[in-house]
Regions:
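Short, flexible helix-loop junctions that flank or precede catalytic/ligand sites
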Residues: 1-251
Length: 251
């Protein structure tokens, strides 16, 4: 099976993820459970070939240098996928997270009305939190979609990688992918303040500098959206404070 056939099987079975790992058969995650596909185990050379075929030269160089890399990948008429490629003790590995081909709306998600109320706040920092697979990116995409359809402004996103692709409607949308359109979150956020955005989406608050820049953007008249990998809203505040040096925490 080639990668397109494996991904088609994954999508057909409504899997959230396709796992490729040297030494074992391909597996899919369905309803939270990881299940084997009824095909022979793949060796390192096979997995390596499958993932190399869909990577750009830059992605290949990153993988060879850092032993892991992230990127997005689309198959026309099927879906988009967020891909993480890595090495493990048996050889190459990769995980393909399925991204819906259409952006779900807040109504599709049955989101409470507070989500629309947050969007109407002119400035501030809106954080969507939760563990991996909890729907953070899907929720943010729905919020961006609502703004795009109902407001007039400039939406700037910085993502690693771009997951949901938005088409400008009432808003101008510029989506920047880390390592393709910018060197990093920090560089993109510094530049963002000179790009006249009304709304800024940061794919993930990963480190102190990114958090500082997101807070600065919120304090200087922008509505900033971001995700944080925490299990609750209360723990999110603690997580952000803990990132700062001891001397700055009381501030």
């Amino acid at each position: 099976m080639d990668i397109a056939e494996l991904l088609a099987f994954s999508v057909k079975n409504k899997a959230s993820d396709l796992h490729l790992s040297a030494g074992v058969p391909p597996m899919i995650r369905v309803d939270g459970d990881v299940r084997r596909i009824n095909v022979p185990a793949l060796d390192h050379k096979q997995v390596h070939s499958l993932i190399y075929d869909i990577m750009s030269d830059k992605q290949r160089r990153d993988y060879e240098e850092f032993f892991e890399t992230d990127f997005s990948f689309a198959i026309e008429g099927m879906a988009r996928f967020r891909v993480n490629v890595f090495n493990q003790n048996r050889g190459a590995g990769a995980v393909f997270r399925t991204i819906p081909s259409e952006v779900l709306t807040l109504e599709d998600l049955n989101a409470p009305k507070v989500f629309k109320e947050l969007i109407e706040v002119p400035v501030g920092l809106v954080l969507v939190t939760g563990p991996t697979g909890s729907g953070k990116s899907t929720t943010l995409a729905a919020m961006v979609d609502h703004i795009n359809k109902n407001e007039y402004g400039h939406i700037l996103t910085v993502e690693d990688p771009i997951e949901f692709v938005h088409t400008s409607q009432k808003c101008l949308i510029n989506q920047r992918e880390v390592h393709r359109d910018t060197h990093g979150f920090n560089e993109a956020l510094r530049s963002a303040l000179r790009e006249d955005p009304d709304y800024i989406l940061v794919g993930e608050l990963r480190d102190l500098e990114t958090i500082r820049l997101a807070l600065t953007a919120a304090e200087t008249g922008h509505l900033v959206f971001a995700t944080v990998h925490t299990s609750s809203a209360a723990k999110t505040i603690d997580r952000i404070i803990d990132v700062f040096p001891a001397g700055e925490k009381p501030m």
